[in-house]
């Protein structure tokens, strides 16, 4: 996530050497603003040209569940326009900034033409999950040692149906969960 320059400088050469595919999720403002520590559009094009899937993470990486419907649409539209201008196409995949979303954000991401979206909740994708609510295992300097990696690649899903509440954004803690 986030198109940090360290991905281009350190992670990508390792992934490339071992022929491991990956997706880079990009918020366009930090790239447009040439924010230190982030990639450039040229580096993103190099990754794209070498088989890396480029996904969207919005325009400004906001807490999208706090935005109005119009602001959500603006975040998605401006970001998509920048991708079309800079890399010649709109990403098919979306990662919710901070992994946070509610039903309104999910619906707008879907309406905007993305084919799948990812949160930041750890878990294994399985057939009972919605394609716009896909989990991921974080792999970074804090949660990326070999034990964590082995746990993630060997994890099995716990298929749950009839999850309650339907809205993934929990405002009450402790929440009242129900599932079968």
Regions found by a protein language model. Give the residues of each.
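C-terminal active-site subregion of NodB/CE4 polysaccharide deacetylases
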Residues: 4-8, 45, 49, 59-62, ...
């Amino acid at each position: 996530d986030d198109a940090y320059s360290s991905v281009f400088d350190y992670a990508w050469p390792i992934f490339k050497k071992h022929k491991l595919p990956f997706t880079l999720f990009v918020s366009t403002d930090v790239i447009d603003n040439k924010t230190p520590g982030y990639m450039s559009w040229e580096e993103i094009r190099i990754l794209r040209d070498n088989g890396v899937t480029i996904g969207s993470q919005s325009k400004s990486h906001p807490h999208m569940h706090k935005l109005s419907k119009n602001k959500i649409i603006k975040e998605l539209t401006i970001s998509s326009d920048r991708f079309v201008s800079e890399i010649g196409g709109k990403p098919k995949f979306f990662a919710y900034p901070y992994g946070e979303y509610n039903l309104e954000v999910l619906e707008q991401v879907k309406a905007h033409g993305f084919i799948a979206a990812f949160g930041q909740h750890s878990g294994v994708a399985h057939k009972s999950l919605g394609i716009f609510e896909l989990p991921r295992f974080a792999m970074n300097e804090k949660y990326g040692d070999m034990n964590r990696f082995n746990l993630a690649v060997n994890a099995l899903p716990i298929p749950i149906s009839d999850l309650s509440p339907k809205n993934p954004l929990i405002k009450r803690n402790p929440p009242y969960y129900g599932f079968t």
